[in-house]
Amino acid sequence: MSGRDSKMLESKELIESAYDLRISSIKPCRAGYILDTDNGKKYLRQCQCSENRILFVHDAKQHLHNHGFVNLDTYCVTIDEHPFIEIEGQLFILTPFIDGHECEFGDDADAVKAAQALAAMHKAGKGFKPQNGIFMPNDLGKLTDSLSKRYDEILRMRRKAERERGAFDYIYLNCVDKFIGLAEQSLGLLGGPEYQRLIKKTLLEGGICHHDYSYQNIIMKGPITYITGFESCGEEIRIYDLVNLLRRKMRKCNWNAPKASLLLDAYSELEPLSRDEIVVMKAMLLFPQKFWRVANRYYNSRRSWAQKNFTGMLEEVVTEFTDHVHFMGQYDNLF
């Protein structure tokens, strides 16, 4: 037994008294622990967030639950009504344990369920504003600056590649211009009035953006799809989540337009997309996100052992380019 696990066993009584539970066993699981209790299985894990962030996430989850979206990992509260417990100076959160499988984006049925659950979550999140005194993380309106910065980094990395001339650099220089073209198209669309209108609409309506809608945070249990891992949630246009889902699915199916339609139809059936959202989604999907990420990680790590790995990853991105461009050519016909 590791020192970490033995410390958790030593904290059993503290957890029981804080949550008014009786724990029969504590088992390590992933980054936390499964607790068998007299109130069902629970999942305890350390949270790297600040106390204010936990309070905000708890507030957001309560709003979702109170507005009909109950398939999520709500925080259990202590007898003092706190959504966390402090153990040896560290903050821990307790949630119901959801025993299911992580979403397989390569599986159409899983991806469609993920789109449906996302729409239901966004619908329930409307009108959300945090309680007084709780700071709301806000990324609203920062997309243009963020992508512009990444565009500048792509240009800067081109100059770096011209100086270095290694295997990775040659591949980068061979393809960078066409990815720059995609980035410029993306920023051109974002510079239109649609994005500004979406920002104003989101500010007016309120809402919850998950901000980390990835496979490990989408749990399938029988016919029910649970959304977990809300620690990055905040105020942002809702299509940020939908674009993340689409991008992950598209990379699993060579940017197949009919499969994108499956997800868009599943989402829109509950939450129709506006013309402004369709335009801004196009801008976001155009941006060569993975190309930037792979190159950025390579030029900022420069560990010799990683060069082969990053070169392979870059080659994968280059191989994907034609399918990506073809998909973007079909994008407007999806709506």
Locate each region found by the language model.
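Active-site acidic catalytic loop and adjacent metal/ATP-binding pocket
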Residues: Y33-D36, Y75, G188-I239
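ATP-binding pocket architecture of kinase catalytic cores
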Residues: G40-G133
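ATP-dependent phospho-/nucleotidyl transfer catalytic cores
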Residues: R45-Q48, G133-I208, T311-V317
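A glycine-centered beta->alpha junction motif in the catalytic cores
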Residues: F92-F105, E153-A161, L245, F287-W305
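ATP-binding glycine-rich phosphate-binding loop
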Residues: S11-T37
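ATP/Mg2+ or Mg2+-diphosphate-binding catalytic cores
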Residues: F291-F335
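Active-site activation/catalytic loop segments of kinase-like enzymes and analogous catalytic loops
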Residues: I239-P272, L285-S304
